[in-house]
């Protein structure tokens, strides 16, 4: 009579052991999976610390409070994978403060070859005598790209190595044919590499789609300005999952040389997305009369050239205020020097609302952005008010123009990072050493690598499952 009961107890005990082993294995699998996601990366954040004092834009980073604020090391990646002129800046150092009425953001990055003297093409277009590097872009086509001149296009002309030839230029890469617009100009280097002169947005889209875009061409005398930008997300989808921009035409639905472009270059990929962008440009907004050609000719004090009804107060450095959404990229002023203006009237002073100061020393750019926390009501549709208690999603980009980065060819954060105004003092951080061929500096650094929000959600779900598994194990073995 006891044997069946003993067998039943044995089976019950074995069932417990089996269930326990399965749950334990599941628990370990979850832990191993979570181990592959560094916990320091699950909540990327830029704290903006409360300080007493103002920005010193004449000497960025020199204000006494900066020495108490830790650097945050933000990883950057190539905007165009595999392009040799994309992703040249691997990390960006950032720290931020607020003083009750202004937010001040300090950036620093390694730049072995500063783009001194290069015009911003948009600024150069306002000044007819402009000369020197940066007046327009030149594209290096993918090695192996060839060309022919199709003579049956009798109304077309092409320019090859300075010679005007009747016929239409057709590019060929691995059997993919791309007929070029009328009056297309190319230079063929001695090694067969093709350099395309000028680059309207639609052309860049077509070249990129057909695998012919290799990068922007530079040499010792032709290059582009350096840039740094901060994107402030203002869209309806929270949190945003993408900070990328479309490559496309100049306006939505643009018809160019027989091709219609649905997307506009610079418009946001994120559905429901919108953002304000602060763009510093060494060849237009630096306020350095020696190396910034726009300030050298006093461009921003000349309303007859800029088309603006106001001038740059005190001729200080600034960041171009941009606004982008799913439709287009815009400029938050009335002239539309870089992009289409958001409106044709009002917005007095908006182009120079964000102040900047910049220095280049020992192989590093240091750029300081300063902006009032509150914006005028006329700006509020395109610029965020920044307040305590709110989380902001920001992204960063850097261009090294001397090395070929310009326009959509840049180094970017792979996702948005959170930014908040805080009232607590900075936390202690590990001291790290930044080394390069030209400078060695010891500074406090917190490393932040942006990861997709989906990874964060998976991590949280995994932790919850692990806790539930432990509870089940406890209940099973307690019985």
Swiss-Prot record:
Topology with regard to the membrane?
Answer: Multi-pass membrane protein
GO CC annotations on file: plasma membrane
Q: Does the keyword Cytoplasm apply?
A: no
Q: Does the keyword Iron apply?
A: yes
Keyword field = Cell membrane, Electron transport, Glycoprotein, Heme, Iron, Membrane, Metal-binding, Transmembrane, Transmembrane helix, Transport
Record: glycosylation sites: 73, 99, 152, 172, 182, 191, 219, 262, 288, 302, 325, 348, 385
Q: What Gene3D superfamilies does this protein's entry cite?
A: 2.60.40.1190
Q: Name one GO molecular function term.
A: metal ion binding
User: Which Pfam families does this entry report, sorted A to Z?
Assistant: EB_dh
What domain of life is recorded for the organism?
Archaea
Tell me where it resides: Cell membrane
What residues form the membrane-spanning segments?
Answer: 19-39, 456-476
BP-aspect Gene Ontology terms? electron transport chain
Q: What does this protein do?
A: Monoheme cytochrome whose physiological function is not yet clear.
What is the designated name of this protein?
Cytochrome b558/566 subunit A
The gene designation is cbsA
């Amino acid at each position: 009579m006891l044997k069946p009961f003993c067998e039943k107890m044995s089976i019950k005990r074995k069932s417990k052991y089996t269930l326990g082993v399965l749950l334990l294995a599941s628990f370990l699998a979850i832990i191993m999976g979570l181990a592959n996601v560094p916990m320091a990366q699950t909540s990327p954040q830029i704290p903006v610390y409360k300080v007493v004092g103002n920005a010193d834009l004449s000497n960025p980073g020199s204000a006494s409070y900066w020495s108490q604020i830790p650097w945050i090391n933000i990883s950057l990646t190539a905007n165009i994978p595999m392009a040799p002129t994309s992703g040249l800046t691997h990390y960006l150092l950032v720290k931020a403060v607020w003083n009750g009425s202004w937010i001040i953001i300090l950036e620093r990055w390694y730049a072995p070859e500063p783009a001194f003297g290069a015009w911003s093409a948009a600024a150069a277009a306002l000044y007819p005598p402009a000369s020197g590097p940066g007046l327009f872009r030149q594209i290096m086509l993918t090695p192996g790209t060839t060309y022919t001149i199709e003579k049956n296009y009798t109304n077309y002309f092409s320019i090859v190595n300075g010679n005007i030839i009747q016929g239409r230029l057709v590019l060929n890469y691995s059997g993919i044919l791309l007929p070029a617009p009328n009056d297309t100009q190319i230079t063929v280097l001695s090694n067969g590499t093709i350099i395309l002169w000028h680059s309207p947005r639609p052309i860049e889209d077509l070249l990129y789609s057909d695998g012919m875009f290799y990068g922007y061409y530079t040499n010792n005398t032709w290059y582009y300005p350096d840039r740094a930008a901060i994107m402030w997300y203002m869209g309806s989808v929270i949190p945003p999952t993408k900070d990328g921009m479309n490559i496309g035409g100049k306006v939505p639905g643009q018809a160019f040389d027989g091709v219609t472009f649905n997307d506009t270059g610079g418009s946001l990929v994120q559905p429901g997305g919108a953002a304000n962008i602060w763009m510093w440009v060494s060849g237009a907004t630096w306020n350095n009369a020696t190396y910034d050609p726009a300030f050298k000719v006093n461009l921003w004090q000349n309303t007859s050239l800029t088309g603006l009804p106001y001038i740059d107060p005190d001729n200080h450095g600034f960041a171009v205020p941009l606004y982008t959404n799913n439709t287009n990229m815009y400029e938050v002023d009335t002239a539309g020097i870089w992009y289409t203006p958001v409106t044709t009237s009002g917005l007095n002073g908006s182009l120079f609302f964000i102040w900047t100061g910049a220095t280049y020393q020992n192989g590093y750019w240091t750029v300081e952005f300063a902006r009032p926390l509150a914006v005028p009501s006329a700006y509020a549709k395109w610029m965020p008010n920044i307040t305590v208690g709110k989380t902001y999603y920001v992204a960063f980009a850097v261009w090294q123009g001397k090395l070929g980065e310009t326009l959509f060819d840049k180094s970017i954060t792979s996702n948005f990072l959170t930014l908040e105004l805080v009232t607590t003092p900075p936390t202690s951080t590990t001291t790290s050493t930044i080394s390069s061929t030209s400078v060695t500096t010891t500074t406090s650094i917190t490393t932040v690598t942006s990861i997709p929000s989906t990874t964060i959600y998976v991590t949280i779900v995994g932790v919850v499952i692990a806790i539930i598994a432990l509870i089940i194990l406890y209940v099973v073995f307690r019985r």
